């Protein structure tokens, strides 16, 4: 099963194929998208029209308007396909449906949805008159043009005047349609995250906490041993599990860290560092739960050892760019992002003494900062590939406020958008649960 990233990538490749007029490749890429949206069926229909196959285009536009019954531009293009098949009555019906979906608006701007096209009401009426001309209904065609002219479309008065003159002379009209080469494009905010990162030759292992690791540099190992750091198997436990090509939340690290860390090793002498290590009160157990999805480019046939090395380098990069969060004492659900150095130092000062230690979470969000966290009030099932689904009580990291109604967030290694009305700020959810108590059932 392809991931969201793979589907967006195929969508983008299909758009590029349309731009170079490679119709077969475009259809192949658009057809590879799992559970296609109405926009994807629309794209297929446009490609079939450009390739000169109106019959296949008609089937694709049928699926598009079935998926989205309010898709005015879909009805417009289906009318164009029927017109090319000389089904003029069906074309008139489709243009009427397109006009109905305009809902008395003069224009629908599809640019914000990824299609560089503005559907004008006068164009739909013009096409309706054109189909009526082909059906021999010249009087109806003239009346339709009168209705189009009455809307006083900006910049189209001359076109409609010429069209009226042609109809009076019983000269057929040419159709208006979506310009050649224009199809729905994927959301721009996803495109910048498509390219996998090349980790070959860029990451270096400067130190290791793995016992008997022969890859660490001798000088660094001797410094660590002299400072009293003797990593053992109990200090580092890594469990890596994969499902469906994605790294699932299965990477856990338990290690010892200073409660109030001072300067780095290069700024502290080995003697003072060793003294600090021997003081048990200066140490606290930190458990880090990591969630990563790692994209890799590897040569076909790469050996297991080489692949594990590349994966280790990729994980090293992810830990450097991932979002750290901590679980406050007594909190079972809420993870609070650590966004600044001051935040971390405040956490060190408030870590309680005891075996519980400090619980951290590191999530791969491609280096994007977490604005705040929200908690789901209801279940939300993804309706489209770009959506993020969750269940009631799940905590979601908010990465971006898309608009007044939608947020972009991250949960369990997945990034997507979701309705703002399904979530509340983490603190508000906790307060509501304390006041109201658990609520039976949920809402989809």
From Swiss-Prot:
Keywords: Cell membrane, Cytoplasm, Membrane, Repeat, SH3 domain, TPR repeat. It holds the Pfam family PB1. The keyword Amino-acid biosynthesis does not apply. The keyword tRNA processing does not apply. GO terms for molecular function: SH3 domain binding; small GTPase binding; superoxide-generating NADPH oxidase activator activity. It is found in: Cytoplasm; Cell membrane. This is NADPH oxidase activator 1. TPR repeats lie at residues 7-38, 39-71, 73-105, 122-155. GO terms for biological process: regulation of hydrogen peroxide metabolic process; regulation of respiratory burst; superoxide metabolic process. PROSITE patterns: PB1 (PS51745), SH3 (PS50002), TPR (PS50005), TPR_REGION (PS50293). One of its GO terms (cellular component) is cytoplasm. Residues 258-274 have a biased composition (Low complexity). The gene is Noxa1. NOX1, NOXA1, NOXO1, RAC1 and CYBA forms a functional multimeric complex supporting ROS production. Interaction with YWHAZ prevents the interaction of NOXA1 with NOXO1 and RAC1 and its targeting to membranes, hence reducing its ability to activate NOX1. Interacts (via N-terminus) with SH3PXD2A and SH3PXD2B; the interaction is direct. Interacts with RAC1 and NOXO1. Interacts with NOX1 and NCF1. Residues 230-246 have a biased composition (Polar residues). Belongs to the NCF2/NOXA1 family. Functions as an activator of NOX1, a superoxide-producing NADPH oxidase. Functions in the production of reactive oxygen species (ROS) which participate in a variety of biological processes including host defense, hormone biosynthesis, oxygen sensing and signal transduction. May also activate CYBB/gp91phox and NOX3. Residues 1-223 are annotated as: Mediates interaction with RAC1. Residues 285-365 form the PB1 domain. Its main location: cytoplasm. The SH3 domain mediates interaction with NOXO1 and NCF1 and has autoregulatory function. Widely expressed with a tissue distribution similar to the one of NOX1. Detected in colon, uterus, prostate, small intestine, stomach, lung, thyroid, aorta, inner ear and salivary glands. Expressed in colon, small intestine and aortic smooth muscle cells (at protein level). Residues 369-428 form the SH3 domain. Residues 215-280 are annotated as: Disordered.
